[in-house]
Amino acid sequence: MMERATTIWLASYPKSGNTWLRAMYSAWSSQEQARLDRLQGLPMAASRQAFDDALGIDSADLTADEIDLLRPRADEVIAAQDRRDGEIRLRKVHDALFTGPAGEPVVSVSAARCAIYVIRDPRDVAVSLAHHTDRSMDYVVDYMASHVAALGAAADWLEPQVRQRLGTWSEHVESWTEQDVIPPLVVRYEDCLRDPVAVWSAVLDFAGLGVEPDRVSQAVAASSFTRLQEQEKREGFNERTSPSGLFFRQGRSGGWRTSLPAELAAKLESDHQAVMQRFGYLEGDG
């Protein structure tokens, strides 16, 4: 039997719960309380440093398209080292699963053990993303409908992450959930809030990592949203971008009802109706 690949792609649109699941993985693998500083050991797919180190080149000398062309090769170098070390690595991905200049996905297919796609009600995403980026909600709602939306795409300075093309929120969801090159398990953020033990057990089972009920329960307790929020307040978190707010801000569903203006909620529902309906976000008003 062929040995399974070592990279689990943990994919999501920004502010959809990706980091919370990374914390669960950290707590599960270490069998200790989740530590935010340990998440740096789970480098995201768009890490410029990881890309440069893997290929031994300086990405500052490359265009964004040239980097996209080489990113799968960098993933394969990292995966090969993980295979030698006997390690299975969870890697955060915010890119939509678009194809790059050579016609292949921007992350490596051959390195992939599987994909976990985390989806969240886009109305809650909009509120969370506005706080995270210090942008207006009007701006964020328009951004979520932009076909050219991207992270790390600044032209006048070098960011620690390489460009990540997002597309619209709907395009992002469909790019991961309507493909079969990297088998995906779709996890709703709301279900994770409701029953994190069941969701994390399903993730482990899907990834072929084995489900030990006591270990799962301990990992979930050790990475609770409250604990992560308290830790961030005490020690900070390097993934926080807004100086005025926490990365782990509220961690609940349905907050859009009191935070998002009605006309913006209606625009999101119109822009993303088909995908929202498919994943149950328009049934009973989310």
Regions found by a protein language model. Give the residues of each.
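An amphipathic alpha-helix signature
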Residues: 123-126, 197-201, 213-217, 265, ...
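Short, surface-exposed helix-loop/turn micro-motifs enriched in polar/charged residues
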Residues: 82, 211-212
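Short, flexible loop/turn segments with low-complexity composition
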Residues: 214-221, 280-286
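PAPS-dependent sulfotransferase catalytic domain
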Residues: 1-187, 242, 249-254, 258-286
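PAPS/PAP-binding and catalytic site of the sulfotransferase fold
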Residues: 17-31, 186-211, 219, 227
